[in-house]
């Protein structure tokens, strides 16, 4: 179920403040965030965020195509090692 239009996109308040500080300073540093649920806004384009995946911060460079998506979509939390090999085939 999609979010209601009258509510607008969800973004944590501290995230807006951090992004504004980096824009004012003109620095190109990675902004560490823990809010995977926040929506990417147009004012975040060009910035790099370190999105926490449960163990480390994954750098995510925001571009125009990402606007409207959530930060968590670009920082996978699970590692896929592939399906287990067939034990019968290994013995031969």
Swiss-Prot record:
InterPro entries: Ribosomal_uS19, Ribosomal_uS19_bac-type, Ribosomal_uS19_CS, Ribosomal_uS19_SF
GO molecular-function terms, A-Z: rRNA binding; structural constituent of ribosome
Name of a matching Pfam family: Ribosomal_S19
Keywords: Ribonucleoprotein, Ribosomal protein, RNA-binding, rRNA-binding
Highest taxon above the source species: Bacteria
GO cellular component: cytoplasm; small ribosomal subunit
GO BP, sorted A to Z: ribosomal small subunit assembly; translation
Role, per record: Protein S19 forms a complex with S13 that binds strongly to the 16S ribosomal RNA.
Family affiliation: Belongs to the universal ribosomal protein uS19 family.
Name recorded for this polypeptide: Small ribosomal subunit protein uS19
Source organism of the structure: Rhizobium johnstonii (strain DSM 114642 / LMG 32736 / 3841) (Rhizobium leguminosarum bv. viciae)
């Amino acid at each position: 179920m999609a979010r209601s239009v009258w509510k607008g996109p969800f973004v944590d308040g501290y995230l807006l403040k951090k992004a504004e500080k980096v824009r004012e300073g003109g620095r190109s540093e990675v902004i560490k965030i823990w809010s995977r649920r926040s929506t990417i806004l147009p004012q975040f384009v060009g910035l790099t965020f370190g999105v926490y995946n449960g163990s480390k911060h994954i750098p995510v460079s925001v571009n125009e195509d990402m606007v409207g998506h959530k930060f968590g979509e670009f920082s996978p939390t699970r590692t896929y090692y592939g399906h287990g090999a067939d034990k019968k085939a290994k013995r031969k």
